[in-house]
């Protein structure tokens, strides 16, 4: 990826985002986000000022998802650039959550806003239909 490839940067950070989520690595997951970070899901707006603010919610969410739904992993169904500029990309995404036996928990469309901060691409905001 080069500075001239904003969509490539957005894809790389969203790969790291999902890989760290699947590994239940909250610290690595938090490192893929820009702060302050906005998440709109389950009818709630969450604003995390920094990684220390996000980590407890991420750890709790990962644990609850495993216990409540039997979640094992998630996969991207698609990631499509809606708009792309030199420092910001809007992605139309959808992911599916799976149980260990491969059965589907649900499909969740979302919009992600990816920004470049210095030489890094990070997820600044997410609006999804995921619980």
Which ranges hold each PLM region?
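Residue-level signal for tight coil/turn positions that link beta-strands
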Residues: 86-88, 118
């Amino acid at each position: 990826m080069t500075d001239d490839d904003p969509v490539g940067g957005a894809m790389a950070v969203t790969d790291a985002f999902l890989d760290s989520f699947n590994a239940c690595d909250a610290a690595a997951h938090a490192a893929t986000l820009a702060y302050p970070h906005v998440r709109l899901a389950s009818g709630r707006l969450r604003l995390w000022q920094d990684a220390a603010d996000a980590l407890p919610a991420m750890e709790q969410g990962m644990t609850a998802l495993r216990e409540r739904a039997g979640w094992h992993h998630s996969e991207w169904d698609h990631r499509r650039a809606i708009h792309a500029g030199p420092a910001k990309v809007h992605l139309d995404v959808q992911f599916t959550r799976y149980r260990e036996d491969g059965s589907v928990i649900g499909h969740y469309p979302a919009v992600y806003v990816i920004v470049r901060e210095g030489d890094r691409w990070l997820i600044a905001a997410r609006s999804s239909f995921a619980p």
